[in-house]
């Protein structure tokens, strides 16, 4: 957090190397939540096909779940990113990886859709994304479902990169006193990411401003 507040940006590999040299450890473990439980519902086709390019907001969204382990407990983050600006459309933080986590995430994202927008929403083949209630809600919102091929994380590379960024900029540079402290810092980081963290590919703008400019120009 201190490096971020001072607007100092470091590559995550540099952070890892320096931590190793100094004998520092990360006190929070972050890993991909393994949600695949076989074909428990309908598998959607891979419509995204690693084409992460867009011409406007709300064309292509991606989602996934990541898991944090600390103080003997687990916390789950379920976000949706818009590929046009890498904007965090919505997210839910949950103590358990239940269906309501992704349903609430989807509701929050759909509320932001302009009239007539019909994005693709890409995910892995996790059980919650195969669930009939989730798929019905996608249909109700006019969102087209896309899924990665089984066991192929590169099909959702943008989300994987986002989780890597989160790990390097929050977990490696911060210690936490409690679960609640971690949650507060996580929420603060996600706000910083959307509204303040500039990206070179967005012409030096943070995702929220780039997105707003694109929506205004449409």
Where are these regions (language model features)?
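Active-site beta-loop-alpha junctions of metal-dependent nucleic acid enzymes
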Residues: 73, 92-115
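C-terminal domain-tail junction helix/linker
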Residues: 132, 139-143, 165-218
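Basic, flexible linker segments flanking DNA-binding modules
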Residues: 1-56, 152, 208-215
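Conserved, non-catalytic sequence blocks in retroelement Pol enzymes and Pol-derived host proteins
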Residues: 7-8, 53, 70-71, 125, ...
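Acidic/histidine-rich, metal-coordinating catalytic segments
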Residues: 115-130, 149, 205-206
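An active-site-proximal beta-strand-loop segment
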Residues: 54-89, 95-96
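Mobile genetic element proteins and their domesticated derivatives, centered on retroelements
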Residues: 15, 19, 48, 64, ...
